[in-house]
């Protein structure tokens, strides 16, 4: 009996369970394969004792419409930077990758499917270079992997953000206010741009293009002066002003620095007030609401396609590669290519042209 190990790493997102289910159901058609799941990414292998569950068709029945991941996930640590607490209470990290590879060999693992974002797939590439039979499945609601046209969970996150814009429009109009909606997007503003277009926002602030606060002030004052006494601004969490920085905190809780973004909405309002904008402004942060809940139909289908393709890549020995969506096909691309550069919004993209055609300001 051959053994396949499946793990989910990084932040959770809608569609993870649908991928797991698809892998297990496809593997069940090949009688010689057993599928295992490592709890909290690689932690389940590195912990003592190990925490691994057998993923059977019965266990994954009906999980495709559930949010989260039944094998849990983590965005802390990993085989190459495992956190260790020192005697003096400080933290450091060590490389346990060779130890983990020995444990996988001892467990009789023939192949690994890693479902995760850019950080997870960089780990996948490094493990492949060390000889591990590994395949990547892209997962990021930011949609910031350049080797795939879309990642599962992104469309659900856009839907959630768009619904928030719709609701803020009605309350903004009722109170003659400006609402600033902060959505996820560290380096790529795809969620903000899509939801701004879908929801009819007045201004959209993206990480790719530092904004000019005076352009926003002028734009919103013109709107109020023309009897449209309300507006919605959609801002990516990674947006920043010209000659300014992103809003973030540095966390060192597990021995290495982790950059936690958040707070652009609040700072943007402070900047607007400092620039002389006198109208009432409020901010709303969606945060992890974008990661949770039921995946929409599009993401369920894409997740199913990714899961089936990933297992078939295992059968074909296509290790060191990642599943990718190149419309209309699901294909395999090298992990090295997948993590080479991010997928960012460009000024000459159709989506930016559409936003400008709808008179949505990018404040640049």
Name every feature range the model reports, one short phrase each:
Residues 35, 103, 111-116, 122-126, ...:
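Accessory alpha-helical/coil subdomains and C-terminal extensions
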Residues 1-9, 17-108, 115, 119, ...:
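A cross-family phosphate/adenosyl-ligand binding-site feature
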Residues 21-30, 51-58, 126-136, 152-156, ...:
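A glycine- and small-aliphatic-rich helix-loop capping segment at beta-alpha/alpha-beta transitions
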